[in-house]
Regions:
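Metalloprotease/metallohydrolase-associated module, dominated by Zn2+-dependent proteases
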Residues: 2-70, 87-172
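Active-site recognition of the HExxH zinc-binding catalytic motif
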Residues: 74-86
Length: 172
């Protein structure tokens, strides 16, 4: 299913609306779209000691039409909430109780994670990045890794059944 494709202007308009609603302007903060972001869908970047906002960064996979408008708005609002809470409190609040209270005030979940299904493009990129598949010889439990140590099979055992492990190199 394909949803609305977002661009920087759409994001800035939504951030401007949030700023007007909560009386904290963020129109001067740059917005960037990153193709490299795979673990997080959004990020609020600020200078460590002064808390001066640097930029909002959003994953290209979030904005490519794979996620519903509600999900995209929730991620953008979450990052705005980081900006709002840090600015009001005058210190980085990460995901503390003040941040969670502001999330509820803004009508979004206060989780540090999301339960969104990974888009097909993002899932494909993540799967491509794995170079090794590790399989337990006893129970068949499988994990994937990007890097492993030379003596991996000698030093480690299966976490479920303590069986020996076999490393399979994935073809690219």
């Amino acid at each position: 299913m394909s949803y609305k494709v977002w661009n920087i202007e759409h994001i800035k308009d939504f951030l401007k609306t949030l700023g007007e609603k909560y009386k904290l302007s963020c129109i001067n903060i740059p917005v960037r779209i990153s193709k490299r972001m795979t673990r997080a869908l959004g990020l609020y970047v600020y200078k460590k000691h002064t808390l001066q906002p640097v930029e909002f960064v959003f994953s290209a996979y979030l904005l490519d039409g794979s996620y519903s408008e509600k999900e995209v708005r929730q991620v953008i609002t979450h990052e705005f909430c980081h900006y709002y809470t840090d600015t009001i409190e005058g210190k980085p609040c990460k995901h503390n109780n003040k941040f969670k209270r502001n999330c509820i005030l803004m009508g979004i979940t206060d989780n540090t994670y999301n339960n969104y299904k990974l888009s097909d493009k993002l899932l494909e990129k993540v799967e491509k990045s794995y170079k090794y598949k590790i399989v337990c010889n006893n129970c068949g439990y499988t994990i994937k890794r990007k890097r492993i140590r030379k003596n991996f099979t000698k030093n480690y055992r299966c976490g479920k059944c303590l069986g020996t492990l076999k490393v399979i190199e994935l073809q690219k």
